[in-house]
Amino acid sequence: MFATLAAPQPPLPLDLVAAIQDLKRELNAVILAHYYQDPAIQDVADYIGDSLGLSRQAASTNADVIVFAGVHFMAETAKILNPDKLVLLPDLAAGCSLADSCPADAFAAFKAQYPDHWVISYINCSAEIKALSDIICTSSNAVKIVQQLPPDQPLIFAPDRNLGRYVMAQTGRQMVLWEGSCIVHETFSERRILELKATYPNAQVIAHPECEEAVLRHANFIGSTTALLNYSQTEDCDTFIVVTEPGILHQMQRRNPQKTFIPAPPQDQTCNCNECPFMRLNTLEKLYLCMRDRKPQIELPEDLRLAALKPIQRMLEMS
């Protein structure tokens, strides 16, 4: 008996960027990339944005193939919005600690304890959690959406407790919070940010609302990645301490080459960066290979897709 040998794979092209552009034309593909992706991936993307912007692009694209340079729940959202399109994710292992912190069975049991509550879920969650939700939000529109909901309507906010607390502070609404968090944003160190402020006394601290309250209290500005990017561009300040995943610094520096952007460090003294290990699983090589091989593909059962679609559509309508 002889083992079946795998067919040899063709070598990688010397110019990956040119090869990706050729495949994009061949497939009629669009490359969507999150701000937290590696700069090399951002530079070949057709659109770079935050979760809200990427959702809008996914909903409106005329491309036949969506190549999502991000994490799994983002590619899932693109598939939910585009069931007839081929949606590719360079690395299926690119998950999300926040999405993983909210298992569907545990959340369903949690939701059952509050039968009169509406569920507003942060888009950083699985399709199963979206299907259990009444409306989806992003960090860009969470405050705006909660402000539009009936003031006497009880709410559950999931899965990010830090974003939920921020939304409660901004709106004055009490909400029942699921105790989830992002491993990147919860590990920023208040002490080390204060040390940076002492070193750069004229710098402004700009932070993502997924951070802990102890960190946010030192921020001059709090907002989504797009809001942070816009603020750094328009604010009359030369130096910013950026308290979110450092992939965003690539776009900040491109738009503001004369300004200085300092990535906030985590608590761990051995590292001065706080990169998302899941976002960084995607590489230029994997991007090329997923387009060449038309896989990994994102697939969802139709009943789950339809259930998850409704709260996403509500979000887009209210945004």
From Swiss-Prot:
Location(s) in or outside the cell: Cytoplasm
Record-listed [4Fe-4S] cluster binding positions: C96, C182, C276
One Pfam assignment: NadA
Cofactors named for this entry: [4Fe-4S] cluster
InterPro entries: NadA, NadA_sf, Quinolinate_synth_type2
Catalyzed reactions: iminosuccinate + dihydroxyacetone phosphate = quinolinate + phosphate + 2 H2O + H(+)
One cellular component (GO) term of this entry: cytosol
Enzyme Commission number: 2.5.1.72
Disulfide topology: none
GO BP terms in the entry: 'de novo' NAD biosynthetic process from L-aspartate
Keywords in alphabetical order: 4Fe-4S, Cytoplasm, Iron, Iron-sulfur, Metal-binding, Pyridine nucleotide biosynthesis, Transferase
Listed pathway(s): Cofactor biosynthesis; NAD(+) biosynthesis; quinolinate from iminoaspartate: step 1/1
Record keyword Iron-sulfur present: yes
Gene Ontology molecular function terms on file: 4 iron, 4 sulfur cluster binding; metal ion binding; quinolinate synthetase A activity
Record function comment: Catalyzes the condensation of iminoaspartate with dihydroxyacetone phosphate to form quinolinate.
Family to which this protein belongs: Belongs to the quinolinate synthase family. Type 2 subfamily.
Annotated protein name in UniProt: Quinolinate synthase
Name of the gene encoding the protein in the UniProt record: nadA
